[in-house]
């Protein structure tokens, strides 16, 4: 079973969302294998379909002054924060990896992060009510998935060295009685994404049962607007398929960030 992965560096939420849509179309058509994207976002607050504006506790002027983007998207779930120091993993996987079971998929994703955190002696686990990965009563990683035609997008956000004060701007995932934490806070020392990425990748591959894991490069078909880091590049024209099909082809896919799990074609797993 083959897995491709790519470290995208820092990438805007909108560009990452568009990239996932494109890759999902390619995965649905069988043009690429399961693909794992590792990245971090500039400061952004995302609002799912069940999000309440009251769960954003800072006014728009205050957010803008802090360089925080606000994006309303069509996934399930409520309000979530992403920012520097947070390892984000997006999984463009076919559900055949878990015999079609979304619950099994979520369980394995949580298990991946629990095992990864154990490398640093962090005892993480599951919450009896809320989704995600927790250390005691504090959440260290949020999960959120969308499924279309048996192919997933979205994934997890793990707080590595995240500025936790940013979570005071929102009610994270609508949970008012739970705190948030990070690896850096627990360990009381600096932790980098560079340290954490390979461990998460290894645990993901082992937990999901991939036997062949290989890196893949993303080549923008358009000229970057400013050059430099990949985060400054336009990601609207990308293809991960192999050499026999090098040209990018936009595969039309409908928006699938629908609330609830009542459609075989389009399902979502709220972020939490």
Where are these regions (language model features)?
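Short, conserved beta-strand/beta-arch hydrophobic-aromatic motifs that form part
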Residues: 56-59, 143-160
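Generic secondary-structure signature for well-ordered alpha-helical cores
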Residues: 118, 205-209
């Amino acid at each position: 079973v083959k897995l491709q992965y790519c470290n995208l560096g820092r990438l805007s939420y909108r560009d990452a969302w568009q990239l996932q849509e494109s890759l999902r179309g390619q995965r649905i058509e069988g043009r690429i294998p399961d693909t794992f994207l590792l990245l971090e976002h500039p400061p952004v607050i995302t609002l799912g379909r069940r999000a309440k504006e009251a769960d954003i506790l800072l006014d728009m002027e205050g957010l803008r002054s802090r360089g925080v983007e606000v994006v309303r998207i069509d996934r399930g779930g409520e309000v979530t924060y992403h920012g520097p120091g947070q390892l984000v993993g997006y999984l463009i996987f076919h559900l055949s990896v878990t015999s079609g079971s979304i619950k099994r998929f979520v369980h394995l994703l949580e298990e991946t992060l629990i095992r990864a955190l154990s490398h640093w002696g962090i005892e993480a686990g599951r919450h009896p009510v809320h989704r995600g990965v927790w250390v005691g009563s504090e959440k260290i990683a949020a999960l959120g998935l969308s499924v279309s035609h048996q192919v997933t997008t979205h994934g997890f956000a793990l707080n590595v060295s995240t500025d936790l004060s940013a979570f005071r701007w929102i009610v994270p995932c609508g949970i008012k009685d739970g705190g948030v934490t990070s690896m850096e806070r627990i360990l009381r020392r600096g932790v980098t994404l560079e340290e954490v990425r390979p461990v998460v990748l290894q645990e993901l591959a082992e937990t999901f049962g991939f036997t062949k894991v290989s890196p893949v490069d993303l080549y923008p078909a358009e000229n970057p607007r400013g050059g430099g880091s990949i985060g400054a590049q336009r990601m609207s024209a990308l293809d991960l398929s192999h050499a026999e099909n090098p040209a990018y082809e936009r595969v039309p896919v409908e928006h699938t960030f629908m609330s609830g799990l009542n459609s075989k074609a389009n399902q979502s797993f709220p972020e939490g």
